[in-house]
A protein has these predicted regions:
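Metal-dependent nuclease catalytic cores that hydrolyze phosphodiester bonds in DNA/RNA
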Residues: 1-111, 118-134
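An active-site-proximal "capping" alpha-helix that borders the catalytic cofactor pocket
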Residues: 132-143
Length: 144
Protein backbone atom coordinates (compact mmCIF):
# COMPACT_ATOMS: atom_id res chain seq x y z
CA UNK A 1 0.00 0.00 0.00
CA UNK A 2 1.28 3.45 -0.92
CA UNK A 3 1.28 6.05 1.82
CA UNK A 4 0.43 9.65 0.92
CA UNK A 5 0.56 12.90 2.89
CA UNK A 6 -1.96 15.10 1.08
CA UNK A 7 -2.79 17.05 4.25
CA UNK A 8 0.81 17.96 5.02
CA UNK A 9 1.21 16.27 8.39
CA UNK A 10 4.67 16.64 9.96
CA UNK A 11 7.24 14.31 8.41
CA UNK A 12 7.73 12.22 11.60
CA UNK A 13 4.16 10.92 11.21
CA UNK A 14 4.93 9.77 7.68
CA UNK A 15 8.28 8.27 8.69
CA UNK A 16 6.68 6.39 11.56
CA UNK A 17 3.96 4.91 9.35
CA UNK A 18 6.48 3.92 6.67
CA UNK A 19 8.55 2.07 9.29
CA UNK A 20 5.55 0.60 11.13
CA UNK A 21 4.80 -2.50 9.05
CA UNK A 22 2.22 -4.86 10.51
CA UNK A 23 3.15 -8.52 10.60
CA UNK A 24 0.75 -11.38 11.19
CA UNK A 25 3.69 -13.54 12.26
CA UNK A 26 3.48 -17.06 10.90
CA UNK A 27 -0.29 -16.98 10.56
CA UNK A 28 -2.04 -17.38 7.23
CA UNK A 29 -4.65 -14.89 8.37
CA UNK A 30 -4.86 -12.58 11.37
CA UNK A 31 -7.81 -12.15 13.67
CA UNK A 32 -8.21 -8.53 12.55
CA UNK A 33 -8.34 -9.63 8.90
CA UNK A 34 -10.75 -12.43 9.73
CA UNK A 35 -13.31 -10.10 11.29
CA UNK A 36 -13.30 -7.96 8.15
CA UNK A 37 -15.32 -8.76 5.04
CA UNK A 38 -13.80 -11.67 3.06
CA UNK A 39 -14.16 -9.63 -0.13
CA UNK A 40 -12.31 -6.66 1.38
CA UNK A 41 -9.55 -8.97 2.64
CA UNK A 42 -9.17 -10.62 -0.77
CA UNK A 43 -9.14 -7.31 -2.65
CA UNK A 44 -6.60 -5.76 -0.26
CA UNK A 45 -4.31 -8.77 -0.77
CA UNK A 46 -4.77 -8.71 -4.55
CA UNK A 47 -4.33 -4.96 -5.06
CA UNK A 48 -2.02 -4.04 -2.18
CA UNK A 49 0.55 -2.43 -4.50
CA UNK A 50 -2.07 -0.16 -6.08
CA UNK A 51 -3.90 0.97 -2.94
CA UNK A 52 -3.21 4.37 -1.39
CA UNK A 53 -3.90 5.62 2.11
CA UNK A 54 -3.21 9.05 3.51
CA UNK A 55 -1.28 9.29 6.76
CA UNK A 56 -4.00 11.63 8.09
CA UNK A 57 -6.46 8.74 7.85
CA UNK A 58 -4.18 6.70 10.10
CA UNK A 59 -4.03 9.13 13.04
CA UNK A 60 -6.08 6.91 15.39
CA UNK A 61 -3.93 3.95 14.40
CA UNK A 62 -0.76 5.95 15.13
CA UNK A 63 -2.14 7.06 18.50
CA UNK A 64 -3.17 3.47 19.22
CA UNK A 65 0.35 2.25 18.52
CA UNK A 66 1.72 4.89 20.90
CA UNK A 67 -0.74 3.91 23.64
CA UNK A 68 0.12 0.23 23.17
CA UNK A 69 3.85 1.00 23.44
CA UNK A 70 3.27 2.87 26.71
CA UNK A 71 1.03 0.19 28.21
CA UNK A 72 3.44 -2.56 27.16
CA UNK A 73 5.98 -1.19 29.62
CA UNK A 74 3.58 -1.54 32.55
CA UNK A 75 3.41 -5.32 32.84
CA UNK A 76 1.97 -6.12 36.25
CA UNK A 77 2.28 -9.41 38.14
CA UNK A 78 -0.10 -12.10 36.90
CA UNK A 79 -0.39 -10.52 33.47
CA UNK A 80 0.85 -11.32 29.99
CA UNK A 81 1.33 -8.35 27.68
CA UNK A 82 1.22 -8.40 23.85
CA UNK A 83 1.35 -12.17 23.39
CA UNK A 84 0.85 -13.50 19.86
CA UNK A 85 -1.10 -16.76 19.84
CA UNK A 86 -1.98 -19.15 17.03
CA UNK A 87 -4.61 -21.81 16.49
CA UNK A 88 -5.67 -23.88 13.53
CA UNK A 89 -9.27 -23.60 12.35
CA UNK A 90 -10.54 -25.26 9.19
CA UNK A 91 -7.01 -26.10 8.11
CA UNK A 92 -5.85 -22.46 8.33
CA UNK A 93 -3.43 -21.06 10.89
CA UNK A 94 -5.08 -18.05 12.55
CA UNK A 95 -3.00 -15.63 14.60
CA UNK A 96 -3.77 -12.81 16.95
CA UNK A 97 -1.86 -10.60 19.35
CA UNK A 98 -3.66 -10.10 22.64
CA UNK A 99 -2.92 -6.76 24.31
CA UNK A 100 -3.31 -7.91 27.90
CA UNK A 101 -4.15 -11.17 29.62
CA UNK A 102 -4.85 -11.02 33.34
CA UNK A 103 -4.31 -14.41 34.96
CA UNK A 104 -6.59 -15.35 37.85
CA UNK A 105 -5.90 -17.76 40.71
CA UNK A 106 -8.72 -20.07 39.59
CA UNK A 107 -6.91 -20.72 36.27
CA UNK A 108 -9.05 -18.42 34.14
CA UNK A 109 -7.89 -15.26 32.43
CA UNK A 110 -9.40 -11.99 31.32
CA UNK A 111 -8.50 -10.77 27.84
CA UNK A 112 -8.21 -7.03 27.19
CA UNK A 113 -7.90 -5.35 23.81
CA UNK A 114 -7.10 -1.64 23.96
CA UNK A 115 -8.84 0.73 21.55
CA UNK A 116 -8.18 4.37 20.75
CA UNK A 117 -11.13 5.97 19.01
CA UNK A 118 -13.22 9.10 18.80
CA UNK A 119 -15.85 10.18 21.30
CA UNK A 120 -18.44 9.89 18.52
CA UNK A 121 -17.66 6.20 18.08
CA UNK A 122 -18.45 5.57 21.75
CA UNK A 123 -21.48 7.87 21.69
CA UNK A 124 -23.04 5.88 18.85
CA UNK A 125 -21.74 2.48 20.03
CA UNK A 126 -21.92 2.58 23.86
CA UNK A 127 -21.35 -1.19 24.08
CA UNK A 128 -18.46 -1.01 21.61
CA UNK A 129 -18.38 -1.80 17.92
CA UNK A 130 -19.51 -5.26 16.84
CA UNK A 131 -16.11 -5.99 15.26
CA UNK A 132 -14.46 -5.32 18.65
CA UNK A 133 -16.64 -7.99 20.23
CA UNK A 134 -15.89 -10.36 17.36
CA UNK A 135 -12.16 -9.71 17.76
CA UNK A 136 -12.21 -10.55 21.47
CA UNK A 137 -14.27 -13.68 20.83
CA UNK A 138 -11.70 -14.89 18.30
CA UNK A 139 -8.87 -14.11 20.72
CA UNK A 140 -10.70 -16.19 23.34
CA UNK A 141 -10.99 -19.10 20.90
CA UNK A 142 -7.27 -18.91 20.09
CA UNK A 143 -6.32 -18.62 23.77
CA UNK A 144 -8.19 -21.81 24.75
Amino acid sequence: MKLTNRHGLPEPFVMFEEANKYSRGGAEISVTSLIDSPQIFRLKEQYSEELEEDVADRIFSILGTAVHAILETAEAPDTIVEERLYAEFGGKLIGGQIDLQTLHKNGTRTLTDYKTTSAATIRYNPEGKREWVNQLNLYAAIAR
